[in-house]
Amino acid sequence: MSFSQLFPKYNSSFNPLRGSAIQCSVIQLQQNKVLVDTGLKTPIICFQHELKRVPITKQARFHFGIEDVEVFGEPKMLLPKPLEIKCKRKLVWIELTKIWRSDQNLVKGFILNSVKGGYAVAIAGYIAFLPKSLLRSRKVFYSQWRIFSILNMKPKISNIVVKEIGDGKIDYFSPTKSHQKQTKYLGAKLKHWRNMKKNTNVKKKYIFSEKVPTTKKTKQGFKHLGPKPLAYTEKKRETTKQSTKNNVFQLKDQGQGKSLVFVDVLTQSS
């Protein structure tokens, strides 16, 4: 018989463990977790809320349903310290997911270094990713406590994407009023700028007014536009006629009369 025919027969001799119940004992008790000896290759970490129906003591024995057996590798990895570290990381991940789903989505951390497309941020033992577009200011504060908000979490690859909110000096975690929340989220600099804007009176730079000719050059510029409107009185018309004639004769003497013939024609017609 070939290997492909013998292999399924060999596996069929083993009883499948998934879905079955075995007798277990507690090895170690801690604040929120229990180290359980299943009699298999490795012990299993259980949380207290999973074992509420059974009294949690060192002498307790109970039936435990197998879902997934996790192998750590070499026997050295079965020491309690690596197991504690892994359990703590699981508890921290649960707390971070609670913060991410809550209304007050704020976490403290600091920027480690720059990576491709952004920065690496250390948050509670996890390394999160901060894109450059979500950085609050151009100046990067390395190894300083900053406030971040969690945008996305992927438990399969332990990926966390964050956004920078501000520095760690302001108490962002204290309950605030609705009109104060926006200023605190944006940071201390923007709040200071808004207070300065309220206290200062902004003056208008531009004031629109009618143009009044005051010099000879401005008077000549207005006369090129043509005669005055008909609303003026006869005395004003006479003064304008005399002034335009005098200006035309002066310009003719200077050799610029050809370009200003239309002014003389207008004065003759009037």
Curated annotation (Swiss-Prot):
<feature type="region of interest" description="Disordered">
    <location>
        <begin position="218"/>
        <end position="250"/>
    </location>
</feature>
<keyword id="KW-0687">Ribonucleoprotein</keyword>
<dbReference type="GO" id="GO:1990904">
    <property type="term" value="C:ribonucleoprotein complex"/>
</dbReference>
<dbReference type="GO" id="GO:0005739">
    <property type="term" value="C:mitochondrion"/>
</dbReference>
<keyword id="KW-0496">Mitochondrion</keyword>
<dbReference type="GO" id="GO:0005840">
    <property type="term" value="C:ribosome"/>
</dbReference>
<comment type="similarity">
    <text>Belongs to the bacterial ribosomal protein bS1 family.</text>
</comment>
<keyword id="KW-0689">Ribosomal protein</keyword>
<protein>
    <recommendedName>
        <fullName>Small ribosomal subunit protein bS1m</fullName>
    </recommendedName>
</protein>
<dbReference type="InterPro" id="IPR035104">
    <property type="entry name" value="Ribosomal_protein_S1-like"/>
</dbReference>
